[in-house]
């Protein structure tokens, strides 16, 4: 305020001084923030009347001319005439790259790992100066998640109108969209043809994991022939999407290698699944920690199977070795078949907030990941490492992490898992290393 000299006195006694202040603030390298949820009550004419030809109100016309004269170059270079191309004009997007992100719904960043990934990439694109639009395939304004995106600066398309007319919106604005980021095969397949038809955008496909690989592994575990057919169907769909996109990304080198084995020509690269900018060094105090934890959203079948295997094959033997042990099962939407597994030693807690989850990471001695099948890098493993909590996992849980053998304890058979976990739980030197 002092650096720019407050309000410009050329706008005395009133009108345009606030707009001028915003332009001056930007000129000096700062940002002007707009809060769309604020409410302004304005009684037109109460202060200075409504006649722009006399009295104080006349300064409204006079000062608009002064404002235009002062900022003529800025307005010509970075703004558009009134009512011309509002899609580009709003958010001062004349020179911004516009990116459309598509997923199944607005990211529930505190409920599942995939949503956390999408949310963090949205943050990245906004911070990089993109004008970001978001379509959730269910077109529902889940809260508080929709508000969180809007406060970030993301335009979210939701409601019955967009559910019915999203193709019209894409056709009308597609010429300005430079990038389209499609998530998950079952969602991307609905949108990629329209994106190609109505835009010239570079299309990025992010698969999260390989569905065909996950279902093939589940078939190998269960022998369910329907899963083998489903795996073949997914492989066809996923390869079509990968080859149709300009670039496909996955969260680890495992998916990259698997795709290149069956489609060497595919443009596929591994990128980080998570973007943590606030990683703090964590102190591990053995005596202040106890018990075990498992975190996973239960809309994901491998997590349900993991808890069932834990309860039926691991817990009985583990409790014999560690009678006072408690295992906290955390994660959204646990089904009845999981809730019914609860015992004195196995506590089904369900959904926890990010703050509560961090407390579990900081208070539990070990985070366990007893996954028997799945595909892709596991967010629960990366998250535990972020908080400095030791991890006991299967090889499925360790997949995609280079050097996993040196930083994780890994066992695949129930008996081996119990032996290693019980020994690790009591080994202070190993846990604090």
Predicted feature residues:
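A short, conserved alpha-helix in the catalytic core of glycosyltransferases
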Residues: 2-5, 10-41
